């Protein structure tokens, strides 16, 4: 199954993959070679740590390659949804209880990072937003309780 992902998200994953392959993998190979040179491998903590790190890096490389091969890349800048909220939209919300504004972009599950304002398409927040427009009110059931928001702005920024 294809997983939707923004162009920016795909670039970030490709950059990480390239870094792992061209920088981290050679570093670990050198660390293993150095540790081997120290002799007995049974009690060589450096060797075992380097092998463990190699295993982690190789696993992450495989994971990234798999994610990228299943990504359906969506160029947010080319979307023409107007003020309607769809995948890729950057939405400004006003909390009707506190008047605080927050801004989120709806992205694929693999690129979500709430600290950066990136919410997964499958999240309760995104599900409540999809199909809404500027001026609409949404209700989100959060762990802290029920929150009501107004959609202040909808943008499509790449």
From Swiss-Prot:
Gene3D superfamilies: Transcription elongation factor, GreA/GreB, C-terminal domain, Transcription elongation factor, GreA/GreB, N-terminal domain. GO terms for molecular function: DNA binding; RNA polymerase binding. It holds the Pfam family GreA_GreB_N. Residues 45-72 form a coiled coil. Keywords: Coiled coil, DNA-binding, Transcription, Transcription regulation. SUPFAM superfamilies: FKBP-like, GreA transcript cleavage protein, N-terminal domain. The keyword Membrane does not apply. GO terms for biological process: DNA-templated transcription elongation; regulation of DNA-templated transcription elongation. Necessary for efficient RNA polymerase transcription elongation past template-encoded arresting sites. The arresting sites in DNA have the property of trapping a certain fraction of elongating RNA polymerases that pass through, resulting in locked ternary complexes. Cleavage of the nascent transcript by cleavage factors such as GreA or GreB allows the resumption of elongation from the new 3'terminus. GreA releases sequences of 2 to 3 nucleotides. Belongs to the GreA/GreB family. This is Transcription elongation factor GreA. The gene is greA.
């Amino acid at each position: 199954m294809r997983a939707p992902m923004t162009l920016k998200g795909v670039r970030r994953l490709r950059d990480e993959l390239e870094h792992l392959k061209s920088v981290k993998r050679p570093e670990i190979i050198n660390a293993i070679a150095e540790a081997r040179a120290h002799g007995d491998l049974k009690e060589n903590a450096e060797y075992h740590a380097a092998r463990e790190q190699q295993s982690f890096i190789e696993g992450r490389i495989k994971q990234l390659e798999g994610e990228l091969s299943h990504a359906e890349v969506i160029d947010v800048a080319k979307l023409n949804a107007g003020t309607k909220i769809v995948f890729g939209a950057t939405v400004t919300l006003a909390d009707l209880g506190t008047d605080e504004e927050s801004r989120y972009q709806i992205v694929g599950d693999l690129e979500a990072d709430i600290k950066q304002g990136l919410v997964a398409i499958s999240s309760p927040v995104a599900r409540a937003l999809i199909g809404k427009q500027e001026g609409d009110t949404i209700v989100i059931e959060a762990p802290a309780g029920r929150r009501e928001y107004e959609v202040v702005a909808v943008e499509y920024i790449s």
